[in-house]
């Protein structure tokens, strides 16, 4: 019931304040509510809604353990790196939601990631797999193509254009994406002392990256290329974009060894083989001052506080990469052959020989596909033309090019092959006409 005093003054039905004591009184059928009570109700409902949404978000966002388990399905080894990445990514996306939905005096800053590891150790693949799991837009950029504004090359904003394109120009979605910047070690300045000469592809690029790494409203040319004053720009906030920078940082292990007191030269030098002292073990002892000595500027180091180190892949790890992950190369080729009704088998010695070749070429996991293509070329050329091929066995001799793969023919093989491409095209033309 609406409240009235003797002078018929209207009062709020909830707090009892008169219309003179509040800014506004809203009337309903037999009831009144003041602006203060409306605001209080709104806050209560909003808090409850936020709590429900936060709980839902907590259920949706995988825990660090779940993230690592997913990475384990696709990436062999690198357990230490996967653990650090899992925690970092979880905290990053938890921070985004918390900031979006709650007013708080404590602002949690973004923590970008720096990955160090030899070529082919899985840096790019780890970042790609994370984006796949979280279903967020993902873009890869090559730091060596970037130059600072005013010089020939790509502006740093073009990195963001790739992310926007991968998000189908949904800016809000792109603003929660992941950007992987490869070859970041190649933009180290030539010396750890500032130089009076201009370093447009080194220190200059590091300086240009600072703003987007930290968080800024960036103006991105929609067609890419250089900015000019008369074109329209896409505005994107980089505050919640996770940047993962990766590089081999060749030679940084010597800087680390010098710092921790290991002798690398001289008569009394401690001599250890690479097997005894793995580069990965040395890299784990990295400190910010080592990156500074390498040529990264202090401001850049400060914006990538999480450092992840990866181990070089040994023979055993490379064999596992060939066979164990969900999308392992051996499984991919077996599926390709199965499409033509052919079974594909790799002998154990053949897999070992493939791993040895990758180590010899110093290409890590990245070089495995190229080696496989070389081995399989002739067989893949013949199979589509011969319906009687039942099985192919890849031997060590085939990998070393001392012999051809073993091809087993079955004259009685019955194959229900899909219509040839030419036939299917003719059928499609007939249907259209």
Swiss-Prot record:
Record Pfam families: AAA_2, ClpB_D2-small, zf-C4_ClpX
PROSITE patterns, per the entry: CLPX_ZB
Keyword presence, Nuclease: no
A GO cellular-component term linked to this record: HslUV protease complex
Positions with a binding annotation for Zn(2+): 12, 15, 34, 37
Family matches, as PANTHER family: ATP-DEPENDENT CLP PROTEASE ATP-BINDING SUBUNIT CLPX-LIKE, MITOCHONDRIAL, ATP-DEPENDENT CLP PROTEASE ATP-BINDING SUBUNIT CLPX-LIKE, MITOCHONDRIAL-RELATED
Origin: domain of life: Bacteria
NCBIfam families to which the protein is assigned, alphabetical: clpX (TIGR00382), PRK05342.1 (NF003745)
Protein name per UniProt: ATP-dependent Clp protease ATP-binding subunit ClpX
Lineage of the organism: Bacteria, Bacillati, Bacillota, Bacillota incertae sedis, Caldicellulosiruptorales
MF-aspect GO terms: ATP binding; ATP hydrolysis activity; ATP-dependent protein folding chaperone; protein dimerization activity; unfolded protein binding; zinc ion binding
Family, as annotated: Belongs to the ClpX chaperone family.
